[in-house]
Amino acid sequence: MIDIKHHGAVSGVTGSCHELVVGRSGILIDCGLFQGAEAGNGASASNLAIDFSISHIRALVVTHVHIDHVGRIPYLLAAGFDGPIICSEPSAIMLPEILEDALKIGFTRDRALIERVLGLIRSRLVPVPYEQWHSVFDGKDESLSVRLQRAGHILGSAYVECEAESDGEFERVVFSGDLGASHAPLLPEPQPPERADRLVIESTYGDKDHESREERRYRLKAVLEHALEDGGTVLVPAFSIGRTQDLLYEIESLIHEFGSDEVGPDLPWRDLEIVVDSPPILPVSTGTSSLSGTLKPPNWSVRAGTRSRSNNSR
């Protein structure tokens, strides 16, 4: 028997957690936090609990490190999960950073406890390259291999191809994770899978038409110039991994294009100060230099990271 069960992101778009059942075994695709209205009254036990059987779960596959896809991993470990955490190589680097911040904000400030949890997570991480099959289990009556393909959503994001066999039944199941748009400034756009017998696909923005990235860039320029003309400051709530890097890149491209022009009175673009108040962001941004093979050429401009000043207050 090959089956799919959903333990999150069913009636909403957060808390992503899907189970692929292959005979008497299974894997999870993501294990994320419920957020916003879907979290009800917040981080309650009912929202964080792993309320499904995991005794047969052989591995967790992470599509990317946004908290609505990975935030319940500590609770999965506490529930007794002892299998590997399979993810892309960039995600393996970023996941402990992301979960450390999440643990400090929503779980505990106990440094020793946080380090124990992060140490356990690091010991379970199995980074795998894109475009290569990885065997999860291979038994007499059931087997499963997974392959990660670039999803273009954030650094390290992947969609997951699963090649499953159970009692002579074969099936290719694909889980999309979150997919990026075309013409992203930093990441190559995702390529479709070669085939799928079943496809589980996200639909967060399925009913929306977005403006072009070029229009968005010049609208950002107009906003900055309007605010700075009056001596103001622009505040942008862009906490999440991915959007912040995109925003820094877009601002850097404007600085490069309009360097000596004034963005405000006696303020040339090249002297524009950028302050990032988000502890996980700059370690991820500056760490991308070691992961340049996963980025679209030209690679991430390190200037966009070094120009930014971190206000790391937490």
What does each of the following model-derived ranges do?
Residues 162, 196-208:
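Gly-rich Lys/Arg/Thr-decorated short loops/hinges at beta-loop-alpha junctions or inter-strand turns
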Residues 9-10, 31-34, 90, 154, ...:
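Active-site metal-binding loops of divalent metal-dependent hydrolases
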Residues 11, 66-68, 154-155, 239-246, ...:
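Gly/Ser/Thr-rich loops at beta-strand to alpha-helix junctions
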Residues 96-157, 292-314:
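Metallo-beta-lactamase
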Residues 221-314:
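Hard-cation-handling environments
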Residues 3, 7, 22, 133-194:
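Catalytic core of the metallo-beta-lactamase
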Residues 10-15, 22-83, 87-125, 179-188, ...:
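Pre-active-site segment of Zn-dependent metallo-hydrolases
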Residues 185-196, 212-227:
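Structured alpha-helical segments in the cores of large, soluble enzyme domains
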